[in-house]
Amino acid sequence: MSEKTVVKSNVEIGDYSYVNRSSYIENCTIGKFCSISSGVYISPFEHDYGLITTHPIVSSQLTRKRVEIGNDVLISLNVVILEGVKIGNGAVIGAGAVVTKDVKPYEIVGGVPAKHIKYRFSSEEINCLEDLRWWEWNSTKIKKNLKFLSRDTDIIH
């Protein structure tokens, strides 16, 4: 974790994932090999404007929804991810996005609110990568396959 980053005790972070400076993370699970940039806010408290009061005095009465972030996810600079969102493996969140809804595996989203831009790979390639589950390999196997992992997806056809 970098300086000025706050990671609350109710956060689980997978192996090899990192969080850059000035980020705030609570109430979430982050998979392995995730890259989280600076100024990222994950699962900040949301005020329920449907209640009589929006004041956090009633927060102890509310159940917060956990954020789930898959493996090998890239979260760019100054992103906000609201509570309850699920982000699939290999997804990319563009800089400055506010993520209010789930993001599918290998989907690229951006904007306020975050919207679909495109998928990183074809559906066939995504299925192969999901089946491969390389992030579950041990460190020896990963080191032996660095050349493979640094190639484009043409190799999996």
Task: Enumerate the predicted regions with their spans.
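Glycine-centered loop/turn positions within well-structured domains
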Residues: 50, 101, 105-107, 115
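Beta-rich strand-turn-strand
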Residues: 78-91, 97-101
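Conserved G/P- and acidic residue-centered "switch" motifs that form tight phosphate/ATP-binding loops
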Residues: 93, 111
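C-terminal segments of enzyme domains that contribute to small-molecule binding surfaces
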Residues: 55-81, 113-157
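Proline-centered helix-kink/hinge sites
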Residues: 38, 104-105, 113, 133
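Flexible, glycine/small-residue-enriched loop-and-beta-strand segment within the central core
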Residues: 2-14, 18-83, 112
